[in-house]
Amino acid sequence: MNGDKSTLSVIVAGGGTAGHIEPALAVADAIKAIDDTAVVTALGTARGLETTLVPERGYPLELIPPVPLPRKPTLDLLRLPGRVRASVRRTREVLDATGADVVVGFGGYVALPAYLAAGPGLLRRRRRIPIVVHEANASAGIANKIGARRAARVLAAVAGSGVSARGRSDAEILGIPVRASITALDRAALRAEARAHFGLPADGPVLLVFGGSQGARSLNEAVSGAAESLAAAGVAVLHAHGPKNTLDVPATPGGPPYVAVPYLSRMDLAYSAADAVICRSGAMTVAEVSAVGLPAVYVPLPHGNGEQELNARPVVAAGGGMIVADGDLSAGFVAETVIPLLRDPAQLEDMGRRAAGAGHRSAATEVARIVLDVAALTRGTR
């Protein structure tokens, strides 16, 4: 806890999934790079990925009760008011104990209690704490829509996400904060080390495949089903299939390796080893893949509100990738579309350049500066 009020205290609220946590931690890193005396505390719940990711990055984590928002009318909806009150009460305790100067929210069920505890309203505090909201997705969720109504600044990855500050027609468009280890990645310089790390050949095309932290069955089946075609074309594969999944890859004697792993802990090396990627199009995935200039075949999740396809559209429109529907992804598609791409160095180079041009490498620093400006303005008025 921060007892020294000569130092700046920042709360980042973005727990639950990696898509909420990683932007929060990227901004935390950028804040510390600008002001190493600042104290950054993360909010989270006991059931989110933040229990692992936040301590690994060296930040204190304060746990609050989760407030999942039911998508359909169920008994959980009746329990919601009580859960909100309990979570806001605990969040208020954290804000008081840390002497928070600003709250930065990234959406999800951790951000909502932070917005309610910091801002005005029935659950308002004696000391109002300014809020900065960042929306990573192309279509904003309910937490950020609520937070935007009371925020000092509202930021977003893309235009038209459905959130904006009072008096503005849209949010301030800055892109998605991405960790410095990715934005500063020199893929060419790390290529040899990366390929050796995964047991991939030093030369020849490499296809990277991943479906998020849990993998994706449709990606697994389509790409592994094309293993013989890939090997015949001289394409090596690095495939993260998910820790709960298995992958049945046919043997291809004499061909380049098909390296299957449950999870990739070194995404910097994975990106550096690859020439192209097949992946989902969550906001954070699109941000990282475009930031490193990697040509991509995006396969949006087939359910939800269609936001994954929206996330990928700007990069695809810039020429840095393509979108294929989950139901259209097959071993035949990999053989007929992906392999020719991997065998065309000129097209790969052009797509990589266009992908990098669509990325926002400085987003984390820009968001951090806004957060510090908002906090400084508030501290100056106390």
Curated annotation (Swiss-Prot):
Its EC number is 2.4.1.227. Belongs to the glycosyltransferase 28 family. MurG subfamily. It is an enzyme of class 2 (transferase). It catalyses: di-trans,octa-cis-undecaprenyl diphospho-N-acetyl-alpha-D-muramoyl-L-alanyl-D-glutamyl-meso-2,6-diaminopimeloyl-D-alanyl-D-alanine + UDP-N-acetyl-alpha-D-glucosamine = di-trans,octa-cis-undecaprenyl diphospho-[N-acetyl-alpha-D-glucosaminyl-(1->4)]-N-acetyl-alpha-D-muramoyl-L-alanyl-D-glutamyl-meso-2,6-diaminopimeloyl-D-alanyl-D-alanine + UDP + H(+). UDP-N-acetyl-alpha-D-glucosamine binds at T17, A18, G19, N137, R179, S213, Q308. GO terms for molecular function: UDP-N-acetyl-D-glucosamine:N-acetylmuramoyl-L-alanyl-D-glutamyl-meso-2,6-diaminopimelyl-D-alanyl-D-alanine-diphosphoundecaprenol 4-beta-N-acetylglucosaminlytransferase activity; undecaprenyldiphospho-muramoylpentapeptide beta-N-acetylglucosaminyltransferase activity. Cell wall formation. Catalyzes the transfer of a GlcNAc subunit on undecaprenyl-pyrophosphoryl-MurNAc-pentapeptide (lipid intermediate I) to form undecaprenyl-pyrophosphoryl-MurNAc-(pentapeptide)GlcNAc (lipid intermediate II). HAMAP family: MurG. It is found in: Cell membrane. It comes from Rhodococcus jostii (strain RHA1). Keywords: Cell cycle, Cell division, Cell membrane, Cell shape, Cell wall biogenesis/degradation, Glycosyltransferase, Membrane, Peptidoglycan synthesis, Transferase. It is a peripheral membrane protein. SUPFAM superfamilies: UDP-Glycosyltransferase/glycogen phosphorylase. The lineage of its organism: Bacteria, Bacillati, Actinomycetota, Actinomycetes, Mycobacteriales. Its main location: membrane. GO terms for biological process: carbohydrate metabolic process; cell division; cell wall organization; lipid glycosylation; peptidoglycan biosynthetic process; regulation of cell shape. One of its GO terms (cellular component) is plasma membrane. It comes from the Bacteria. Pathway: Cell wall biogenesis; peptidoglycan biosynthesis. This is UDP-N-acetylglucosamine--N-acetylmuramyl-(pentapeptide) pyrophosphoryl-undecaprenol N-acetylglucosamine transferase.
